[in-house]
Amino acid sequence: RGIETRPYVLGGEVTHGDSLGNEGVLGAGSVQWMTAGSGILHQEMPRGNAAGQMHGFQLWGNLPSTQKMTAPRYQDMKSADIPVVTDDDGTRVKIITGEFWGKRGPVDGIAADPQYLDVFVPAGVKKTFRVDTYRRAFAYVFEGAGAFADASGPQGVLLEKEVAGQEVNIRDLSGNRTLVRFGTGDEIT
């Protein structure tokens, strides 16, 4: 109760079902956004790809106290439904939620209105993203190698409690993919 879960499948599949009658299979590049709210029974079973490998993320979010007892809700977005924008330098951004570079991600009606992005920065490129004045940032390099200017965590991880109105710089070391989340709410600790 009182949470949101956000599985993002990069490789393999996740079979899922819940007490509201939602069921299906999340394939590579797909995302699910489940708001547990007042309560839901939910199950997931990962299945590897042809090589038996499963790769992805499962982020959990705590709903604001005023929304803890909201009605349960489920959104399943296939990879083809998630927009990808490409900059002149080859940087590609898959927009799962929020608005970025003039496009909006398909997941909507989310408690904290986050930006949730899958960012590819090509080798030799340094990319700067401006953070809205009311957001905090979390980023993790999960493929290749990269670093963040002035990051508070180890190389490849950015964990910033206060980035509002600042810039997040992703510096490539060998071409990377980075999971980025800008959001509101309690401090990240």
What label would you give each PLM region?
Residues 1-189:
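Jelly-roll (double-stranded beta-helix
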